[in-house]
Regions:
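Amphipathic C-terminal alpha-helical segment
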Residues: 107, 114, 144, 158-178, ...
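Membrane-embedded alpha-helical bundles of multi-pass transporters/translocases
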Residues: 38-41, 52-54, 153, 162, ...
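Generic hydrophobic, amphipathic alpha-helix propensity
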Residues: 16-27, 44, 69-80
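Amphipathic alpha-helical packing segments from all-alpha helical-bundle domains
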Residues: 75-82, 95-98, 102-110, 116-119, ...
Length: 197
């Protein structure tokens, strides 16, 4: 992560943790409604219901909030896939593929704009290493639980799925076809599972 965008403090008390979460939630809500350049720390503080001074105790600038939100999404996505893989270990791969495709679509459908902002700013915020690490976590869990999966093909599949859902989420609402995105995800996962040795 680039210097100057790390949070000022890591909250230890429950109230402080809640405030930090509220800041991230307010930021996500604002970014779902308007472009990044139209969201300021003042807007975020106001939406959170705190003073700008309080916000600056947690984050030095808007980029640090965006970076923390990005890391949170990466963590959530990695945990989601790890849990899905664990849930379907030894069970129907078809059911895993269906649930994974549907879950991804629902996540991006709900937070299309904010996830777009997050993904488009990974490199600028110096988060590419963290993004690759999160994807590797998913890849490792998948190859551990499903013997015979090629880790390189797992990487390509995860990248293809993420790109598919992200690209669909960034289209204007009248052009979004989530069933098409689901089908592409199913096909990519199906090809991966069919490639097992």
């Amino acid at each position: 992560m680039r210097s100057g965008i790390k949070p000022r403090k890591t909250p230890k008390q429950q109230r402080s943790q809640r405030t930090r979460e509220e800041i991230l939630e307010a930021t996500a809500h604002l970014l779902n409604d308007r472009p990044l350049d139209e969201v300021s720390t003042n807007h975020i503080a106001q939406k959170t219901g705190i003073s700008i001074g309080t916000l600056y105790k947690y984050y030095p600038n808007k980029d640090s909030i965006l970076a923390d939100l990005s890391l949170r999404y990466m963590q959530e996505d990695a945990e989601l896939f790890e849990n899905l893989f664990e849930k379907y270990k030894g069970r129907s791969l078809k059911d895993l593929i269906e649930e994974a495709a549907e879950t991804l679509v629902q996540i991006h459908r709900k937070n299309a704009r904010v996830r777009g902002v997050v993904y488009q700013n990974f490199e600028r915020l110096g988060l590419m290493t963290e993004a690759q690490s999160a994807r590797r976590r998913i890849q490792t869990k998948g190859t551990e639980l499903f013997s015979g999966l090629d880790s390189a093909l797992m990487w390509v599949t995860l990248t293809a799925i993420s790109s598919t859902v992200f690209a669909m989420s960034q289209l204007s609402p009248q052009h979004r076809n989530w069933e098409f995105a689901r089908n592409l995800c199913r096909q990519a996962l199906g090809l991966l599972m069919a490639s097992r040795a």
